[in-house]
From Swiss-Prot:
Transmembrane segments: none annotated. It comes from Xenopus tropicalis (Western clawed frog). Zn(2+) 1 binds at residues 85, 89, 104. Disulfide bonds: none annotated. Keywords: Autocatalytic cleavage, Chromosome, DNA damage, DNA repair, Hydrolase, Isopeptide bond, Metal-binding, Metalloprotease, Nucleus, Protease, Zinc, Zinc-finger. A zinc finger (UBZ4-type) spans 408-435. Its EC number is 3.4.24.-. This is DNA-dependent metalloprotease SPRTN. Homodimer.
Length: 436
């Protein structure tokens, strides 16, 4: 035997039912599935009535809200009857477009009696929850005018929210015309004014937040790993210069001090060279791979071009248009080397002549290797010209046409006409003879 929807046994089987599940079951059983698009939910702030059916827009949107404060302590039977009452309103809205909340006419009574006979429920026109409604009316006002002696309210206004009577109420104009008294608040929840002052006071709220933060900071959720494994590295703060940068800045600000230190160093060329190279490495800036004067794009990979002996030769090589112009600057480079030797720190005795000649010969050999590499790179550059951009390839290399392999070219060193395919071997021989 199937239990009725208001059977007392449900108080033990399902005391706190899911309103959405109840709604779907009642929709299929009593309303022919016509309310599938209607929303049903709890309302935590509604205290004047147990339930309400809201109509939204012109597209047939409707929602049912049930009062959680009024129904949470009531028997399950009251929840079921209230839900069925609001579902009848929703059915009239869906079928007859009836949006009147207070309309309990013949059509409403017909569905109400049909469901009552079928289920044994007692769905009524109005919900009789006056005691619960009055329980939530904590804010009272009393009029000091003649309406104190009039029935049925005797000048009292009781509300669940702290909103004094005003012109927003529909009965305000009639009260001003017949009574004209003022409403004075006579009752409110315990400690309500103190809580309100505490919430409105910004200083106390800030103090409360700070104390709360301190309490949270005092809580230990676990052991800090820094107490177990100490940090042994070197830390750097953001926006703080490192020690090496600070030392470089001090050295740049005091050039006389650097000269004094260099003057008192022992006469060792190796130590001087290492000091010069270390300073050059520290002060050098990182060159971007987008710089076409230093890097070229070869099959998608950046390749660094060979650098010359000094900045002057590098600037000249970046502007040259022929290999002949490259070798014309060799004598100028030798002059620059002799002039640059004067910039090295002088000593009381000076280095030996053999060491000096060995040093210059080493520089010339390095310069020769860089020039040979540069020439070979410029001759082989035409093989990958399709993968290079014309603008990015406008570097120190000279453009050579690879289609003229059987033509003769003039050697830039000795002036002899040589086949272009044998120019590399001939240049190696000429360079060796030229340096010796």
């Amino acid at each position: 035997m199937q239990l009725s929807v208001v059977d007392p046994t449900w108080e033990l089987l399902d005391p706190n039912p899911d309103i959405r599940a109840l709604f779907l079951e009642f929709n299929d059983t009593f309303f022919w599935g016509q309310l599938s698009g209607i929303e049903v939910k709890w309302s935590a702030r509604m205290t004047l009535c147990a339930g309400v059916c809201s109509y939204e827009g012109r597209g047939g949107l409707c929602s049912i809200r049930l009062s959680e404060p009024l129904l949470k302590l009531r028997p399950r039977k009251d929840l079921v009857q209230t839900l069925l009452h609001e579902m009848i309103h929703a059915l009239l809205f869906v079928t007859h477009n009836n949006k009147d909340h207070d309309s309990h006419g013949p059509e409403f009574c017909k569905h109400m009696e049909r469901i009552n006979k079928r289920t044994g429920a007692n769905i009524s026109v109005y919900h009789n929850f006056h005691d619960e409604v009055d329980e939530y009316r904590k804010h009272w006002w009393l009029c000091n005018g003649p309406c104190q002696k009039r029935k049925p309210y005797f000048g009292y206004v009781k509300r669940a929210m702290n909103r004094a009577p005003s012109s927003l109420d529909p009965w305000w104009a009639d009260h001003q015309r017949t009574c004209g008294g003022e409403f004075v608040k006579i009752k409110e929840p315990e400690n309500y004014s103190q809580k309100r002052k505490r919430n409105n006071d910004p200083t106390k709220s800030e103090l409360g937040n700070s104390s709360h933060v301190k309490i949270n900071k005092g809580k230990s959720n676990g052991v800090d790993i820094r107490t177990v494994i100490p940090f042994s590295g070197t830390g750097y703060k953001l926006f703080e210069p490192s020690k090496s940068d600070a030392q470089l800045k001090i050295q740049n600000d005091n050039p006389t001090k650097d000269k004094a230190v260099m003057h008192h160093t022992p006469p060792s060329t190796n130590q001087t060279d290492s000091t010069f190279l270390s300073r050059k490495i520290v002060s050098a800036k990182k060159i971007s791979v987008a710089n076409t004067k230093v890097f070229i794009n070869l099959n998608g990979s950046p390749i660094k071009l060979p650098s010359s002996s000094n900045n002057k030769s590098h600037q000249d090589s970046s502007k040259q248009k022929s290999v002949l112009h490259f070798f014309k600057t060799q004598k100028d480079n030798s002059i620059d080397l002799t002039s640059s030797s004067q910039s090295f720190p002088s000593t009381s005795q000076g280095p030996n002549r053999e060491e000096t000649e060995h040093f210059y010969k080493k520089l010339q050999m390095d310069d020769k290797e860089s020039k040979d590499t540069f020439i070979i790179h410029s001759l082989n550059k035409t093989n990958v010209s399709d993968s290079l951009n014309n603008k990015s390839c406008a570097g120190p290399a000279a453009t050579i046409n690879s289609g003229l392999n059987h033509t003769k070219v003039c050697c830039p060193v000795c002036g002899t006409e040589i086949f272009e395919s044998k120019i590399n071997d001939h240049l190696d021989t000429c360079l060796q003879n030229y340096n010796t």
